[in-house]
Amino acid sequence: LYPGKGYIFQASLDCTLSIKIEKNEFGKLPKVDVDTKLDIHTSTNEQNASWNFVGNPYPCFYDIYHMDFAAPITVWSISNRTYSAYSAADDEFVLMPLQAFFVQKPELVDAITFQPAGRQINKTIDHSALAMRRAARSKQVQRKLVDVALTCADRTDRTRVVVNANASDDFCADNDAVKMMAYEGTPQIYTIAGADQLAVNEGAHCDGSVALGMYLPADDAYTIAVDRDELGVKLLDYGVEVEMPYTFSAAEGYMDDRFTLTFEAPTTGINIVATDADADNAIYTIDGRRVNSTAKKGIYIQNHKKIVK
C-alpha cells in the first residue's frame, strides 16, 4: 500500500480487516509536503472523466484547508450512509487517519499537495484561525453559496449552489462536483444542470434559479431546509413559493420536476482582490486561498492581476 493512494476492499461477509504497519516507520514521517499525482482518464462524458481515489497520506487527522487543492472532494459518510462533497475554500472538514476520497482531476492541476501544517491529533477545527482565513478569503473573492438539506427521520443529504459571476454554468471540475448517488436508505438531493446531477453547482446562474432533483428511498415524509444561506434563496414547489423548512410527502423514486430554488442573480463581476493584498506580493488561487508560489499550473491573483500558468 502506498501513501496518498486510495484503496477499496471488498469482502463477501462481515469481517475485520487488519493491515500490518511498521510503527517505527510511521513515527518518522518528515515534515514536508506530500504530493499525490492525479491521473487522466478519458471519457466522452466530462462528468465521468479523470476520477481519482486519493488517500490521506498521514496516519493522523488532516484539515483539508491545508491541501493545496481548491476543487471539491467527495467523501463517504459512514454514519449518514451517503456521499458528501467538500471544498477547502468553503468547508470545515477533517479527514480521518488514512481516509480516502474521490476527486475529479481539474484540467490544469496535476497533483494534490498535502501540506504538513494540516496534520492534527484529533478532529477539532481551530475556529479562531478558520475565522481569520475565511475573512481574508472574503476580501479576495466574492462568492455566495447556499447549502440545501433533504432529511427523512435521522438521515440527511445536502447539495450546494454557488453564485460566482466569473464562473461558467458549464460543468467544470475546478468548481463543480458530480453527485455520487447512494442507495442505502438515505434520501438523495442534487441540482440539475442539463443532463447532469451535481452535488456542487457553481456558476454565474444569471437567470436566478436552479432546479432541484431528488431520489426518495421510500414512501415517506421528507423535509427540505437551508443549512447555510448567503443568497437569500426561495423554494418553489410546482412554481408556488413555500416557506422552509418545508415538509412534504412523496412516493419512492426520482423527483426531478417539482422543486426549484430562486435567488437574486448577480449584477457585477467578482474576484476582487483586497487593496492591501499587494503589500507583501501575496499570491492567491482563483477561489481566494493564499499560496506560496505559482509553481503549479492554475489561475492565480497577485497584485490585482490574474496569472495563468
Positions of PLM-derived features:
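Compositionally biased Ser/Thr/Gly- and acidic/asparagine-rich
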Residues: 1-278
